[in-house]
Regions:
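N-terminal Rossmann NAD(P)H-binding glycine-rich loop of SDR-like oxidoreductase domains
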Residues: 1-16
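Conserved glycine-rich Rossmann-like NAD(P)H-binding loop of the short-chain dehydrogenase/reductase
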Residues: 17-33
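Conserved residues in the N-terminal Rossmann fold of short-chain dehydrogenase/reductase
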Residues: 25, 52-53, 93, 188
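Residues in the short beta-alpha loop(s) of Rossmann-like NAD(P)-binding domains
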Residues: 27, 37, 120
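Conserved Rossmann-fold cofactor-binding substructure of NAD(P)-dependent oxidoreductases
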Residues: 36, 44-71
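Hydrophobic/aromatic anchor residues within beta-strands of the central parallel beta-sheet
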Residues: 51, 91, 114, 155-158
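Conserved Rossmann-fold NAD(P)-dependent oxidoreductase catalytic core, especially the SDR/UDP-sugar
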Residues: 71-74, 78-137, 142
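NAD(P)-dependent short-chain dehydrogenase/reductase
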Residues: 128-129, 134-200
Length: 201
């Protein structure tokens, strides 16, 4: 809940009649920063946001946060392409196994709906990140089928492309390269890259 997507979704939901919003992430520093930002910018809504430290790799930490939850946006992922190339099993543990853990915990807790975030890189994947996200989608589909048969949560998945200025986006990288007079690192000059802003995502 502390990444680019989590920040944006939180701003959309903060002023609604939702009674409680739970932010679940493994990054205590980002949680603390988010808490301070809420208290400074939205003091009247800050009390309805609760923070939980945990990791999708640890199913018990997911089970601990689930009671009373109705809807989940699952955005936890390793998404840096180079990191996933160098450490592919870490991508599997978070993106594939972590998603499976989350969905099992959600089904056990009787959550109503789970929306999982994937990437356009899962279509015809050519790198470890895309492959791990494609496998994640298969895990989502399999769990959605089981959940539907059991009358459990509605589980769905959405793919989105490159989000401008999100963590790991190429835009800040390109800006820095231009400022420093460095060549822009484009893999293929004929490549097309689809970009959207955070609100569109």
């Amino acid at each position: 809940g502390t990444g680019s997507f989590g920040h944006t979704v939180l701003k959309h939901f903060l002023t609604t009649d939702i009674g409680e919003i739970r932010i679940f992430s493994r990054d205590e520093k980002k949680q603390d920063d988010m808490r301070h930002e809420l208290q400074a910018k939205y003091p009247e809504y800050a009390a309805k946001v609760k923070f939980y430290i945990g990791d999708v790799r640890n199913i018990q930490s997911l089970r601990d946060v689930m009671p009373g939850v109705h809807f989940i946006f699952h955005a936890a992922a390793l998404k840096q392409v180079p990191s996933c190339e160098f450490f592919p099993m870490e991508a599997v543990r978070t993106n594939v196994e972590g998603t499976d853990n989350l969905l099992h915990a959600a089904m056990e807790a009787g959550v109503e709906r789970v929306v999982c975030l994937s990437t356009d890189k899962a279509a015809y994947p050519i790198n470890a990140m895309g492959i791990s996200k494609a496998m994640m989608e298969h895990v989502i589909t399999a769990n959605a089928r089981v959940s539907a048969q059991r009358g459990g949560p509605v589980i769905c998945c959405t793919r989105y492309g490159n989000v401008m200025c999100s963590r790991g986006s190429v835009i800040p990288l390109f800006v820095d390269q231009i400022k420093n007079g460095e060549p822009i690192t484009i893999t293929d000059p004929d490549m097309t890259r689809f970009l959207m802003n955070l609100d569109e995502a």
